Amino acid sequence: MNNLEKYRPYFLAFLRIVVAYMFILHGTAKFLEFPISMTGGNGAVGDPMLLVAGVIEIVGSILLILGLFTRQAAFILSVEMAYAYFFLHVAGKGNLFFPIANGGELALLYSLLFLYFVFSGAGACALDNKFFKK
């Protein structure tokens, strides 16, 4: 298994980029109605909180894809998704310990993934490595 250790930074970069790409789609769906509409085709989301969430998701995801300010962006995104889980899913439907019952499993998973990036950093192929060398 020690032979796999040399690939850790590259897998971490791959995971970071894929998760950020998947998450940016949530932001564009809220803010731009792309690739799907979150309002049933009735124009951009009118709820100011959803618009703010969409901007945070787009900007944060771009930073993660680039690997720039990775830990800070991941922290903000983790807090956003924890907020979504506790104050939207749990508060709306209950079932704190059963995310599948309140529809919050995706929010909880994203929150934990972003929290992982807070502690692990960006991995390989990140602008953080170029601009903020130790």
Curated annotation (Swiss-Prot):
Bilayer topology annotation: Multi-pass membrane protein
UniProtKB keywords: Cell membrane, Membrane, Transmembrane, Transmembrane helix
SS bond partners: none
Pfam families in UniProt: DoxX
Subcellular location as annotated: Cell membrane
Source domain of life: Bacteria
Annotated InterPro entries: DoxX, DoxX-like_oxidoreductase
Cellular component per GO, a single term: plasma membrane
Transmembrane segments: 9-29, 49-69, 107-127
Family according to the record: Belongs to the DoxX family.
Protein name according to UniProt: Uncharacterized protein HI_0886
Species name: Haemophilus influenzae (strain ATCC 51907 / DSM 11121 / KW20 / Rd)
